[in-house]
């Protein structure tokens, strides 16, 4: 787990807590003893439960460990993603749109640092673009999920959560997107982004 500290604060959990989330469940595998010990000794105003993943099952497979425990729509997040958003608004958006899963996606603008060549027939050049600029939505790794998804997870299946979503989408289920700005998403899994995030949060304190 890579829950980020700024000073002595647990960033991800604090953001959810600020919007009224007080019950957290962590699916733990690597160094789970250390993680449990830390939270058991921590003075906190929220509850943390643990689900032990004995064999790594991907970002989605571990949800099968929560069967029978989830009774309402819930936030499901990777442990290296921090969003500067109104989680209450996202939750209401999910419910009002009747989604089975709502994926929170960030707008992204990217300039390709090279000239791009499109290949035509017989090795010819079909088109050339010098350092094209792209605009797209990217998955932040944060979702709002209906409890039904947990109950329908296959026991012991190794699967990423985006693949779980794709399975439902192909079956005709309603899956939606909540778009956020690029600046609202901080990916702590990238060292450069982690440093940017630290500076941003420290400036907010």
Which residue stretches match the model-derived regions?
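Single conserved hydrophobic/aromatic residue that forms the stacking wall/gate
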Residues: 1-12
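Residues at the starts of beta-strands that form the adenosine-phosphate
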Residues: 9, 22-24, 47, 100, ...
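Short, acidic, metal-binding catalytic loop of nucleotide-sugar glycosyltransferases
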Residues: 15-21
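Solvent-exposed polar/charged
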Residues: 3-4, 18, 44, 68, ...
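Catalytic-core segments of class I nucleotidyltransferases/pyrophosphorylases
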Residues: 74-75, 82, 88-95, 108-111, ...
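Conserved beta-loop-beta/alpha segment of the NTase-like Rossmann-fold superfamily
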Residues: 36, 40-121
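Short beta-strand/loop segment that forms part of the nucleotide-sugar
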Residues: 22-30, 51
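General small-molecule cofactor/ligand-binding pocket signal
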Residues: 11, 49-51, 178
